[in-house]
Structures are given as C-alpha cells and as structure tokens.
Amino acid sequence: VDAVVLSAYALVGGPSRSYAAEVLEAARRRELPVFADLGAGAGRAAGKELLKHLRGVGWLLMNEGELKALTGASSISQGVARLRQEGFQHLAVKVGAMGSIVVTPEGEELIEPFPVEDIVDSTGAGDAYTAAFAHAILEGLSPVEAGRLANLAGALAATAIGAQGRLVTLEDLKVAAG
C-alpha cells in the first residue's frame, strides 16, 4: 500500500466510521499519504465533527459547495482560511468551469481548466479529479502539476453520461495532454 484515498462519506457515521478511522490511524502510523475527498453529503451531515476525523490527512479535496458547507463560509477564500485555521494546509478545491485551486503552505494557485468539447455530465468528474490528483502527487509531480492533470481527468470524465460513462485511464491522460 502506497497511500490511502478515502471518501469522507465513510466518516459520517455508522460502522463505516470506525473502519475508516482505523484505516486513517494505520496510515498515520505507517506515515502513508492520505487523500480525503470530502463529498457534499459528508460535510452537510457531519459538519465540523468531520474535521476532527480528518485531522492529519495529507490532502483534503472538495468542490466549492462542499468547502462552503463544511466551513459555513460564504466565499472560497473564507473557507480556505477557516480550514487553514483548523490545521489543514494542503487543499484542492474544484471550482467547475474555472478549474481548481491548489492550496499549500506556500500559497494558493488557480489552475486553469482543461478545455474539452462536449461536456455532457459532471457525474464522476470529481472522483476522476481526486484519483488523478493523488496519482500525480504519488508520482512526484508538484501540487500545481497534479492539479493540471486532475483538471484534465475531471474534464474527460464529464464527456460521457454517468459516473462510469467515461472511465479515464493513464493512457487517456497521456494522449489528451499531448
């Protein structure tokens, strides 16, 4: 195991919370990178309680709505500031047609979207983003480079209907990136 990619939904409650907490603790003990994808329902259902369980994750990934729901913020910058105050220093915020924002201790950078034609359905685009972002970081790319690759993956995933309409592969990313 090289890393843990976790849906924060697993931390909302029920038996999955204890399993997910065990996975996070094992990852911390082994010093494995952890990427937690927030998910809208998780932030709304668990609120600030969720932050307690996410302490120590390497990267927290979310979209703008999820950021605002989790933090109670009215803007992206306010939400990022609140998460930084809570100790989260590595964030990736998906902002739809505007691309994404990568936040590190060194600062924040807006990553331009990857232009694709025929956007059909954004279902699954966030999952593709998270997978590509985690892969890129694990391969040694910078957070900005990871954000670019993740934007591409999310855009390609949105060119088909449904979460599994377009399963983006590494080969797809290589071809599309040129």
Specify the residue positions occupied by each region the protein language model found:
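Ribokinase/PfkB-type carbohydrate-kinase core domain
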Residues: 1-109, 172
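Conserved phosphate-binding/catalytic region of the ribokinase-like
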Residues: 25-29, 74-178
